[in-house]
Amino acid sequence: EAIDVVPCETIDIEVPARSEFIIEGQFLPNRDITIGPHSNPIGYYDDEQLFPLMEVQCITHRDEPIWYSTMEMMPPFDHNYMAVLPIEGELLSDLQTKIPEVNDVVVTPNLSYFVQLSVDGAQKPHPEFGKYVLHAVWGASGRWGRTAKIVVVVGPDVNPYDLNEVEWAILTRVQPQSDTIINQSGQAFLMDPSAPKDSSHG
């Protein structure tokens, strides 16, 4: 169904008539502004950064508009929960096309990745199947797999949405020397303050 559109006030384009706000303006070449320091979604402050300057010419809105905004702070908060949804969907879709035994993917507000399988230890295709899934996460299309810092693979009896259950499974089913992998070729998440300064970022 088509949506109603209306013309802008200062620009020759049409916009959805029921938009909360329409901000009209222009970006001028070689006009930047310094922003920061400011908080980011992982609980740290970013340094000052240069961004293109937008000259606002007009602001219009519908009746009783709602202004959407987030306050960046220590996770968890609303930005984190909104941000992980597309990551979960992207990874789940990619993994299930390659590994039918992948049942679900959960990404926590702190960007830990929990992958739930539909098979338990007795049913898995081969003894190292969990590690195979780990490598599939790091090799997934898009940038989120290769920047995954912590990935945990659990069986069908562990609820990946319950951090206590995941921690219990790690405590009772994992031996670090044989059941963990350090990904030496992984990329650092762009905002990770612990990443080496010369590392590649995703």
Regions found by a protein language model. Give the residues of each.
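Charged, compositionally biased interaction regions
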Residues: 1-202
